[in-house]
A protein has these predicted regions:
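Residue-level signature of outer-membrane beta-barrel architecture
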Residues: 77-79, 95, 143, 159, ...
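Membrane-embedded beta-strand positions of outer-membrane beta-barrel proteins
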Residues: 39-43, 89-91, 139, 153, ...
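Extracellular/periplasm-exposed beta-strand and loop segments of Gram-negative cell-envelope proteins
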Residues: 49-68, 96-133, 160-213, 240-257
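Outer-membrane beta-barrel "beta-signal"
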Residues: 222-223, 254-267
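Hydrophobic, lipid-facing positions within transmembrane beta-strands of outer-membrane proteins
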Residues: 37-39, 69-75, 135-139, 214-218, ...
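Repeated loop/turn-to-beta-strand initiation elements of outer-membrane beta-barrel proteins
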Residues: 84-87, 148-151, 226-232
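Cleavable N-terminal export/targeting peptides
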Residues: 1-34, 267
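Outer-membrane beta-barrel channels and translocator barrels
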Residues: 34, 80-82, 146, 225-227, ...
Length: 267
């Protein structure tokens, strides 16, 4: 992440130097560059979740999935490059959250019940609640398919301002990991987990989540009038939401969300 920030800083300095040379030569390229943008505001809703790519064998069924208030508000700037091609940069404020209830078998867990931490393989049901607030900067190449339709694709970087990953394991049993045994060994002490508070095992992995995320964002804008339009997109995280050393959940969990919304041209 430091290399990316440093690269962006060097690019900005180089662009500023280029603009300064042109101004000194009597041109106004920098002013033309700044005023050659069109600005857009948009509001939308994310539909998706945080999940591994490919369902692991230890997750047997999905009991329920609940939508959350995953709103996104942002401002984008578009700059024409050549012909139908252009560049889009933006600043987005996002919520990415989900709540799932899944049936698992032989699923590695670390939980707390009655103040005691337990680790082992669990068979039963697991509720997972994920909630992330993010500030996202997308950088996209745009192509105007027609005067009313614009396609966009490119990378994004997000800073996670608040994050939660918590839940509980219930209605099942945990084979407790014995000292010196592999964490997947299903022969340890059997600990029964019930349905209600005090009977189930809780977990909270919020402190193990990353502060920065990177991914790919693709989408399309369709303008119904000169200023108003509809938008749709897909953001796919390329970095997992947890730090690389976190191994309680063995599958890498990626934020994968589709977006629908409306867009308004400000200028």
């Amino acid at each position: 992440m430091r290399k990316i920030i440093l690269g962006a800083l060097l690019a900005t300095i180089s662009l500023g130097a280029w603009a300064g040379e042109n101004d000194q030569a009597g041109g106004s390229a920098w002013n033309r560059f700044l005023h050659g943008y069109r600005y857009y505001a948009h509001v939308g809703y994310h539909i998706g979740g945080t999940a591994p790519v490919g369902m692991p064998a230890s997750i047997r069924t999905l009991h329920s999935y609940r939508l959350r208030p995953n709103f996104v508000l942002g401002v984008d700037a578009y700059h024409a490059i050549s012909g139908r091609w252009g560049f889009v940069g933006g600043l987005h404020f996002e919520e990415k959250a989900m709540r799932t209830d899944a049936g698992v078998k032989g699923y590695h867990m670390r939980i707390v019940r009655g103040g005691e931490e337990l680790e082992g393989v669990f068979t039963g049901s697991v509720v997972t609640k994920v909630d992330m607030s993010l500030i996202t900067v997308p950088l996209q190449i745009a192509y105007d398919l027609s005067p009313h339709v614009r396609l966009k694709a490119g990378p994004y970087v997000s800073y996670v301002t608040s994050r939660k990953f918590e839940g509980w394991a219930y209605d099942g049993y945990l084979r407790r990991r014995e000292e010196g045994h592999d964490k997947h060994d299903p022969t340890g002490q059997k600990v029964m987990l019930g349905h209600n508070d005090g009977e189930r095992g809780n977990y909270d992995f919020s402190d193990d989540m990353r502060s920065w995320q990177m991914g790919i964002d693709v989408g399309a804008d369709w303008y119904i009038t000169k200023r108003w339009g509809a938008k749709a997109g897909l953001s796919w995280g390329l970095t997992g939401i947890f730090h690389s050393g976190f191994d309680t959940i063995e599958q890498t969990m990626y934020p994968i969300y589709g977006t629908i919304g409306v867009v308004y041209q400000l200028k």
